[in-house]
Amino acid sequence: MNKDMCVACDDGILNIRVGAIIMKDGKILMVGNDRDYLYSVGGRVKFGETAEEAVVREVFEETGVQMEIDRLGFVHENYFYGDAPSNRNKLIYEISLIFYMKVPDAFAPVSESFMEGSSKEHLVWVSLDEDIPMYPQFFKTELKNPTNMIKHFTTDERSPSAPRSAGRQRPSR
């Protein structure tokens, strides 16, 4: 079995991740656990997988539903400090490719919860206007008016003076 594209480096951890944008009735499907924030459906790319294969696999693992990709929406470079027991306070540089998914009309997750390693996670439908912390944070603004552009965002939480989020875009191909 191929391993997750997660590499321990001298100064931190490098993650290659995919995320899925699953929108229905003006809400987005997000994942939560015992922390006080939500994050996108998705996970790490496995060595030997393409990002497209990884996002389809992750969506199926987390929802039990096979979905097709609509298009690549975002490239997100993210520097942050880990908060899980395995990476607590370690600097993580994560590169995420985030895809809009084609959501079937009758879509409903097979289960509202699933196990990720040893932690239990749950799926939540959230309005972008709800006052709930979610990551990536740019979802709250960018998903209200989606475009056919591939947008690139960089989030840097290494220090209070570091730029929090910056973005640029280019046409989707």
For each predicted feature, which ranges?
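Acidic, metal-coordinating catalytic segment for phosphate/diphosphate chemistry
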Residues: 1-19, 25, 89
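A generic structural micro-feature
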Residues: 12-14, 87-95, 115-120
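Active-site-adjacent beta-strand/loop module that shapes the phosphate/pyrophosphate-binding cleft
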Residues: 80-110
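A short coil-to-beta-strand element that immediately follows conserved catalytic motifs
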Residues: 66-75
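NUDIX/MutT-family hydrolases
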Residues: 100, 110-146
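Conserved hydrophobic "DFG−1" position in protein kinase catalytic cores
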Residues: 22-23, 30, 101, 125
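Charged phosphate-binding loop/patch that engages nucleotide di/tri-phosphates or the phosphate backbone
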Residues: 134-173
